[in-house]
Amino acid sequence: MLDLTNKESESSDNGNSKYEDSIDGREVGTSKPFKEERSLEDLQADLADMAVWMEGLDATKLPLNDPQLLCNGRAFSEVLHNVDKNFFTDGWLETMPENRTTNIMVFRSCTRKLWRKMFDYVNHINRTVVSSRWTDIHERIDGIYESDLPAMVNLGMAVVTLAHIGKNAKRFVDYSKALTSTHKSMMSNVAKMVTTVIDEMPENPCFHEISELHGSQSELNSLSESSGKLNGNGSSERRSNADQILVDAELEIERLRTETENQRKEIERLTKSFETAQHDMSSNSESGDISILEKQNEELRQKRRELEEKNLELDAAVDQFKGIVFELTNENDVLRRSDKERQRLQTVLDAAQSDLDEWKTVANQYQKEAELSKQQDKEIKELLSQNKALKSRLDHHVKSATLEDANKNGIAQLRTQVGGLTALNTELKASLDSKKRCVEQLEIQLIQHKEKVKELEDRKDELIEERNRLENQLIFKEAVTPRSLHESMFEAGNLSFEPFSEKNTLPLEIENKRLTERIQELESLEPLKGELITLKSKNGVLEEEKLFATKQIEELQQQIEDLQENLLKNQEHASGDVVGLKIQLEKAEVEAQQMREAKMRAETNQAQVDEILKKRTAELEVNATALQKAKAVIDELEYNSRPVSEDSMTSVQAFKEMKEENEKLRQKVEKLEIELNTVTQGFEQENRLLTSASHQQVLNRSIDEVMSMRAHAGSEEPQTLLDTQKMSGALPWRSLASETRRELPTAMASILVLGFLVFIAWMFININSALNAPPNA
């Protein structure tokens, strides 16, 4: 695999480097590094054309024409995943970051990771890289526009080319043909870039060509290196490939030896036949036979020379195979020693894997406990909401009870007022009744007096008429009858000597006396009329007082009825609220008991978690020690198997083996880090949940105490509203302070454990960075 992490390495698995090899078809010598001859405008146009081609695949939603956004490799990874999903798998795609950052180190790491996978795919499709364009990509990534644009254009060219030469090449070739009809100029530029990259990635020779190793030494070396490259995917696989090569070489040597022996036997046979022919020539003197024998002799000599040349070539091949066998034997010994170290490291990794399985089990337990904690948290939240509702209702009931007390006092005052008004109403009714009776008596007397007055007036009218009549008669008589002097004198002396006149005067006098008496009676009735008028005025005043008292009585009765209705409603509402409040208080007590039990379970779980955490901390320390030892062994192996100069024996296979094992260990460490982060986050979340639950339980406990005191308040002395409010406001803070003092050691222990976990994570990050550091040459 091409090593992009080591800038000082001058060789790769396929023999390509800054120096040209004989396999490139060029002379051996130093070559200049790749230089981009295109301008920035041309590169931007090329990237835009390739972006149009890749966007037509609908493989990604990320932008493909911005070089800075392409540096994280996610967009190219999604396109490659569409090119060959069997090689560029979903698991590998998930390892490519999706975040956008401007960190140059992240850019370089993502570019190296993407190119390593692309280079593996190039080997997978039996091709090799022969241009220095691809060996210094990391050198052109430094986070500025003028340098990351060429690198992203080159990677885009490689992605488009791999689509046209990969396993699913037919589909993408058809897609390009269909796209040519609408984007001719763009596809022409893309075709040029694909042709350039295909020339720089020729196909590899097959392994069966090793039978033609009678060629030059450089061809043998290149073939051996390419075979090592094609079969270098692990220490066990490389060792099996080396053993297979050694067996094939030994078989080839045996075959060559057998062929050499057969050729020697053929030479001896031909020599004997030549001697026999010479002996026959001495006995046979015919010229025709001699010429034939000479021709045969010449042919035999020519064949002998060819066989001798071939024998020399086979001897050279045997010597060459001896050197190869010696190198493979040494490499096999190194591989065996490395295999022992690998087995030892494998044992350590197996132990780490078992620890990882245990961690996974613990993580699953933590996850289950976290789910239970979430459920408990939901229940606690529901209980808190119910508690708040009950508390609000309790406050409402307290306020309503206070209002009811005030209403009761008002009702008592109103009842007192109603009693006074009722008594006053009774007195007024009694006085009214007495006055009514007086008025009735006065009315009766008035009626009687009115009747008498009417009778008297009638009698008076009759008498007046009678008097007037009599006066008229008297006047008439006087006018008709003349009087004598004697009568005049008699009248003057009030003497009457005539009996007739005495008879007429006597009734008149009697009537006159009667009238005089009647007049006197009437005059005596004048005070009664004044009294009657006075009684009438008093009667009017009493009537007005009666109406006012009746109206006031009706208003008081209406107020009494309203107050009685309000009193009944308040009594019914208060009785219903008291019953509901008692039920809710009982429910709250049951829920408080459940929460106390949940707190006990949580404390038990906390103790268990602390014990498990202590055990896992000790195991983490052991694993960290084992990882330090593994790192030391890896560093020692890398130091012992580092590449040396070209003119002495190298140990590239051992270096590749250590590098791959380092990669595996790095992946293991990353997995362990992920597991550690998951466990740490779960532990932190549990700590937060437990802390919040403990604080909430302290508050609930104080609320329960207040509610219990209120529930038992009926058996104690009655308290005023001000005392109740002071007590409900003072007790929760006192209990909260005491509970806070009790929970403070647990919080400090949680903080210490969290700090220790952060230190473990920091140590794993340092180990990972040390494992990923490039080896020194």
From Swiss-Prot:
<dbReference type="GO" id="GO:0005813">
    <property type="term" value="C:centrosome"/>
</dbReference>
<comment type="subunit">
    <text>Homodimer. Interacts with the dynein subunit dli-1 via its N-terminus. May interact with microtubules. Interacts with sut-2. Interacts (via C-terminus) with unc-84 (via C-terminus); the interaction is direct.</text>
</comment>
<keyword id="KW-0206">Cytoskeleton</keyword>
<dbReference type="GO" id="GO:0008017">
    <property type="term" value="F:microtubule binding"/>
</dbReference>
<feature type="coiled-coil region">
    <location>
        <begin position="425"/>
        <end position="688"/>
    </location>
</feature>
<dbReference type="GO" id="GO:0051647">
    <property type="term" value="P:nucleus localization"/>
</dbReference>
<feature type="transmembrane region" description="Helical">
    <location>
        <begin position="747"/>
        <end position="767"/>
    </location>
</feature>
<dbReference type="GO" id="GO:0005874">
    <property type="term" value="C:microtubule"/>
</dbReference>
<keyword id="KW-0472">Membrane</keyword>
<feature type="region of interest" description="Interaction with unc-84">
    <location>
        <begin position="749"/>
        <end position="777"/>
    </location>
</feature>
<keyword id="KW-0963">Cytoplasm</keyword>
<dbReference type="GO" id="GO:0031122">
    <property type="term" value="P:cytoplasmic microtubule organization"/>
</dbReference>
<dbReference type="GO" id="GO:0051959">
    <property type="term" value="F:dynein light intermediate chain binding"/>
</dbReference>
<protein>
    <recommendedName>
        <fullName>Zygote defective protein 12</fullName>
    </recommendedName>
</protein>
<dbReference type="GO" id="GO:0009792">
    <property type="term" value="P:embryo development ending in birth or egg hatching"/>
</dbReference>
<feature type="coiled-coil region">
    <location>
        <begin position="236"/>
        <end position="399"/>
    </location>
</feature>
<feature type="compositionally biased region" description="Basic and acidic residues">
    <location>
        <begin position="18"/>
        <end position="36"/>
    </location>
</feature>
<dbReference type="GO" id="GO:0005737">
    <property type="term" value="C:cytoplasm"/>
</dbReference>
<feature type="compositionally biased region" description="Polar residues">
    <location>
        <begin position="273"/>
        <end position="288"/>
    </location>
</feature>
<dbReference type="GO" id="GO:0030705">
    <property type="term" value="P:cytoskeleton-dependent intracellular transport"/>
</dbReference>
<comment type="similarity">
    <text>Belongs to the hook family.</text>
</comment>
<dbReference type="GO" id="GO:0005635">
    <property type="term" value="C:nuclear envelope"/>
</dbReference>
<feature type="region of interest" description="Disordered">
    <location>
        <begin position="1"/>
        <end position="36"/>
    </location>
</feature>
<dbReference type="InterPro" id="IPR001715">
    <property type="entry name" value="CH_dom"/>
</dbReference>
<feature type="compositionally biased region" description="Basic and acidic residues">
    <location>
        <begin position="1"/>
        <end position="10"/>
    </location>
</feature>
<keyword id="KW-0175">Coiled coil</keyword>
<feature type="region of interest" description="Disordered">
    <location>
        <begin position="273"/>
        <end position="292"/>
    </location>
</feature>
<keyword id="KW-1133">Transmembrane helix</keyword>
<dbReference type="GO" id="GO:0051642">
    <property type="term" value="P:centrosome localization"/>
</dbReference>
<keyword id="KW-0539">Nucleus</keyword>
<dbReference type="GO" id="GO:0035046">
    <property type="term" value="P:pronuclear migration"/>
</dbReference>
<feature type="domain" description="Calponin-homology (CH)">
    <location>
        <begin position="44"/>
        <end position="169"/>
    </location>
</feature>
<keyword id="KW-0812">Transmembrane</keyword>
<feature type="region of interest" description="Interaction with dli-1">
    <location>
        <begin position="1"/>
        <end position="234"/>
    </location>
</feature>
<dbReference type="GO" id="GO:0031965">
    <property type="term" value="C:nuclear membrane"/>
</dbReference>
<dbReference type="GO" id="GO:0007059">
    <property type="term" value="P:chromosome segregation"/>
</dbReference>
<dbReference type="InterPro" id="IPR043936">
    <property type="entry name" value="HOOK_N"/>
</dbReference>
<feature type="compositionally biased region" description="Low complexity">
    <location>
        <begin position="218"/>
        <end position="235"/>
    </location>
</feature>
<dbReference type="Pfam" id="PF19047">
    <property type="entry name" value="HOOK_N"/>
</dbReference>
<feature type="region of interest" description="Disordered">
    <location>
        <begin position="217"/>
        <end position="242"/>
    </location>
</feature>
<dbReference type="InterPro" id="IPR036872">
    <property type="entry name" value="CH_dom_sf"/>
</dbReference>
<comment type="function">
    <text>Cytoskeletal linker protein, which is essential for attachment of the centrosome to the nucleus. Required for dynein localization to the nuclear envelope. Forms a LINC (LInker of Nucleoskeleton and Cytoskeleton) complex together with unc-84, that may be involved in DNA damage repair.</text>
</comment>
